[in-house]
């Protein structure tokens, strides 16, 4: 049995969510909606990817549908989310990956077309945010619109949870060195709300804001107000890294901290939080399915209560995997799977 899924928005996350969904037998993507991409171009965009490589299966069109590995996927081109005929193909769970409909009010438009649940693949100002491995125990089936938070929150929260549960976080600051995303500019251009954000991503390190650290306070309430952060956008295509500096309540050696993270990576956070002692760099994590991979050899400690921890994440592939995981979890809790 598989839950029938629709994807709204066939951009970076939409396409990689589909690649991830095809690997999960509990997910059946039956439709994609994107008013800005013609069907033939969808085939091309799904087949070729500058970061994750060529799709290893078959992709073609037939009868106005997208055919992936012989599987038919209906294609719609509606700009109005409320006009997408999800019910015509039986799609009940919708991945909202346009980056446009990120509030409950806007994302709820999908319900008009027959959807039962919407998973926003971005942070939301008002929808409940869930991070796999961190706060799924607070899931409430009554909410028709939920958020998978951000890729950075998905990296930071599991690590912060381990440290907070084991040693207690008094306060912390986070920096994410973040790969390029689609909203950035290839050459300098106007950006009235974010002047630095209007500068060319090519050849620049760009300081930026991020709500990822504060969002951890929403998924781990006991950390609310104890954590904030910022971002540096850098000219790499994929894979980002979190630098978490925290002061702990309990004294601990760096080896004790490493041991706690390693234990969690093999136990309750297996598949979510990874652990490595190898001397790695960013490209080593392209295609890594973990939300967060703790780099044990990159961190440093000033004293037994003050430490800098490093965690990598494929901000495209790893995050998209969690979108699919959250969708499956919700479907099971809702009794749809």
From Swiss-Prot:
<feature type="binding site">
    <location>
        <begin position="12"/>
        <end position="13"/>
    </location>
    <ligand>
        <name>NAD(+)</name>
    </ligand>
</feature>
<dbReference type="InterPro" id="IPR020830">
    <property type="entry name" value="GlycerAld_3-P_DH_AS"/>
</dbReference>
<dbReference type="GO" id="GO:0006096">
    <property type="term" value="P:glycolytic process"/>
</dbReference>
<feature type="binding site">
    <location>
        <begin position="210"/>
        <end position="211"/>
    </location>
    <ligand>
        <name>D-glyceraldehyde 3-phosphate</name>
    </ligand>
</feature>
<keyword id="KW-0560">Oxidoreductase</keyword>
<keyword id="KW-0520">NAD</keyword>
<dbReference type="InterPro" id="IPR020829">
    <property type="entry name" value="GlycerAld_3-P_DH_cat"/>
</dbReference>
<dbReference type="GO" id="GO:0050661">
    <property type="term" value="F:NADP binding"/>
</dbReference>
<dbReference type="InterPro" id="IPR036291">
    <property type="entry name" value="NAD(P)-bd_dom_sf"/>
</dbReference>
<dbReference type="GO" id="GO:0006006">
    <property type="term" value="P:glucose metabolic process"/>
</dbReference>
<feature type="binding site">
    <location>
        <position position="315"/>
    </location>
    <ligand>
        <name>NAD(+)</name>
    </ligand>
</feature>
<feature type="binding site">
    <location>
        <position position="233"/>
    </location>
    <ligand>
        <name>D-glyceraldehyde 3-phosphate</name>
    </ligand>
</feature>
<feature type="binding site">
    <location>
        <begin position="150"/>
        <end position="152"/>
    </location>
    <ligand>
        <name>D-glyceraldehyde 3-phosphate</name>
    </ligand>
</feature>
<feature type="binding site">
    <location>
        <position position="34"/>
    </location>
    <ligand>
        <name>NAD(+)</name>
    </ligand>
</feature>
<dbReference type="Pfam" id="PF00044">
    <property type="entry name" value="Gp_dh_N"/>
</dbReference>
<dbReference type="GO" id="GO:0004365">
    <property type="term" value="F:glyceraldehyde-3-phosphate dehydrogenase (NAD+) (phosphorylating) activity"/>
</dbReference>
<dbReference type="Pfam" id="PF02800">
    <property type="entry name" value="Gp_dh_C"/>
</dbReference>
<feature type="binding site">
    <location>
        <position position="181"/>
    </location>
    <ligand>
        <name>D-glyceraldehyde 3-phosphate</name>
    </ligand>
</feature>
<comment type="similarity">
    <text>Belongs to the glyceraldehyde-3-phosphate dehydrogenase family.</text>
</comment>
<keyword id="KW-0324">Glycolysis</keyword>
<feature type="binding site">
    <location>
        <position position="79"/>
    </location>
    <ligand>
        <name>NAD(+)</name>
    </ligand>
</feature>
<keyword id="KW-0963">Cytoplasm</keyword>
<dbReference type="GO" id="GO:0005829">
    <property type="term" value="C:cytosol"/>
</dbReference>
<dbReference type="InterPro" id="IPR020831">
    <property type="entry name" value="GlycerAld/Erythrose_P_DH"/>
</dbReference>
<protein>
    <recommendedName>
        <fullName>Glyceraldehyde-3-phosphate dehydrogenase</fullName>
        <ecNumber>1.2.1.12</ecNumber>
    </recommendedName>
</protein>
<comment type="pathway">
    <text>Carbohydrate degradation; glycolysis; pyruvate from D-glyceraldehyde 3-phosphate: step 1/5.</text>
</comment>
<dbReference type="InterPro" id="IPR006424">
    <property type="entry name" value="Glyceraldehyde-3-P_DH_1"/>
</dbReference>
<feature type="site" description="Activates thiol group during catalysis">
    <location>
        <position position="178"/>
    </location>
</feature>
<comment type="subunit">
    <text>Homotetramer.</text>
</comment>
<feature type="active site" description="Nucleophile">
    <location>
        <position position="151"/>
    </location>
</feature>
<dbReference type="InterPro" id="IPR020828">
    <property type="entry name" value="GlycerAld_3-P_DH_NAD(P)-bd"/>
</dbReference>
<dbReference type="GO" id="GO:0051287">
    <property type="term" value="F:NAD binding"/>
</dbReference>
């Amino acid at each position: 049995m598989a839950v029938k899924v629709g994807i709204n928005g066939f951009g970076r996350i939409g396409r990689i969510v589909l690649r991830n969904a095809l690997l999960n037998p509990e997910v059946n993507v039956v439709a994609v909606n994107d008013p800005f991409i013609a069907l033939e171009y969808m085939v091309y965009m799904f087949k070729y990817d500058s970061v994750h490589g060529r799709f290893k299966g078959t992709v073609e069109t037939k009868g106005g549908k997208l055919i992936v590995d012989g599987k038919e996927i209906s294609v719609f081109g509606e700009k109005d989310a409320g006009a997408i005929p999800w019910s015509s193909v039986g799609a009940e769970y919708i991945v909202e990956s346009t980056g446009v409909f990120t509030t409950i009010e806007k994302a709820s438009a999908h319900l008009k077309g027959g959807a039962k649940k919407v998973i926003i693949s971005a942070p939301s100002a008002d929808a409940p945010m869930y991070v796999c491995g961190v706060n799924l125990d607070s899931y409430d089936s009554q909410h028709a619109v939920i958020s998978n938070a951000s890729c950075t929150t998905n990296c930071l929260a599991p690590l912060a949870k381990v440290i907070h549960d084991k040693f207690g976080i008094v306060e912390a600051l986070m920096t994410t060195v973040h790969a390029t995303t689609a909203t950035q500019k290839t050459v300098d251009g106007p950006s009235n709300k974010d002047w630095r954000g209007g500068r060319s991503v090519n050849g620049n390190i760009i300081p930026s804001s991020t709500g990822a650290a504060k969002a951890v306070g929403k998924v781990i309430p006991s950390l609310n107000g104890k954590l904030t952060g910022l971002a540096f956008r850098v000219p790499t295509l994929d894979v980002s890294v979190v630098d978490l500096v925290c002061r702990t309540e309990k004294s601990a050696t760096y080896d004790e901290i490493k041991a706690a993270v390693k234990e969690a990576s093999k136990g309750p956070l297996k598949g979510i939080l990874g652990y490595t002692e190898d001397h790695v760099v960013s490209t080593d994590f392209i295609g890594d399915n973990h939300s967060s991979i703790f780099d044990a050899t990159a961190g440093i400690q000033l004293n037994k209560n003050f430490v800098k921890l490093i965690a990598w994440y494929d901000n495209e592939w790893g995050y998209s995997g969690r979108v699919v995981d959250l969708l499956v979890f919700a479907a099971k809790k809702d009794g749809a799977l």
